[in-house]
Amino acid sequence: MALRTLASRKTLAAAALPLAAAAAARGVTTVALPDLPYDYGALEPAISGEIMRLHHQKHHATYVANYNKALEQLDAAVAKGDAPAIVHLQSAIKFNGGGHVNHSIFWNNLKPISEGGGDPPHAKLGWAIDEDFGSFEALVKKMSAEGAALQGSGWVWLALDKEAKKLSVETTANQDPLVTKGANLVPLLGIDVWEHAYYLQYKNVRPDYLSNIWKVMNWKYAGEVYENATA
């Protein structure tokens, strides 16, 4: 891990400590920005190091800070019995909490090519994909098409419906987490189609980003989530 990357993360973590400590004292559970399991430049050329650094240090860090702030405000509003404030804070909690949840999944969905990123799924997940979509290639085509067609900002997901015991492709708007589409849906893969995920490298050509991100997809992680969810 580059020293600059580590230093930046330590600074972010230190800045979050006073808020987290104050929240913990009152029993409020805050969240922290997770470290990435690879260096910012490790996904090049599919995703540039600059995009990964900004995406993690700025965008995800902001969701974490704003979510924790909203939790603090909610805690105070509940203590006062301030119903209008409690209702008002729900949108900030959903948006920023969803941003944290979604990005935490997204980082694990990616892996450097040198470490197996882009290797197709095998075993149970591979068989399930063939059964539910016809082929791995058909799934990639479907997810890429739905991600490209999504208006505005959002996410495209490969989900497991635990009740139906089938895989499905879902989209969510803005930072809505997959659970908003159904409590029975387990996210196996999530692709961020907000412009901040690709614009510095791919400009306004979202399909090119969606074509290249498969080269660094961590199917091993997705397979592990699938096997745990179906055990």
From Swiss-Prot:
Binds 1 Mn(2+) ion per subunit. It is found in: Mitochondrion matrix. Residues 1-27 form a transit peptide. It is an enzyme of class 1 (oxidoreductase). One of its GO terms (cellular component) is mitochondrial matrix. GO terms for molecular function: manganese ion binding; superoxide dismutase activity. Its cofactor is Mn(2+). Pfam families: Sod_Fe_C, Sod_Fe_N. Mn(2+) binds at H55, H103, D192, H196. It catalyses: 2 superoxide + 2 H(+) = H2O2 + O2. Keywords: Manganese, Metal-binding, Mitochondrion, Oxidoreductase, Transit peptide. It comes from the Eukaryota. Its EC number is 1.15.1.1. InterPro entries: Fe/Mn_Superoxide_Dismutase, Mn/Fe_SOD, Mn/Fe_SOD_BS, Mn/Fe_SOD_C, Mn/Fe_SOD_N, Mn/Fe_SOD_N_sf, SOD_C_sf. Destroys superoxide anion radicals which are normally produced within the cells and which are toxic to biological systems. Belongs to the iron/manganese superoxide dismutase family. Homotetramer. PANTHER family: SUPEROXIDE DISMUTASE 2, SUPEROXIDE DISMUTASE [MN], MITOCHONDRIAL. This is Superoxide dismutase [Mn], mitochondrial. The gene is SODA.
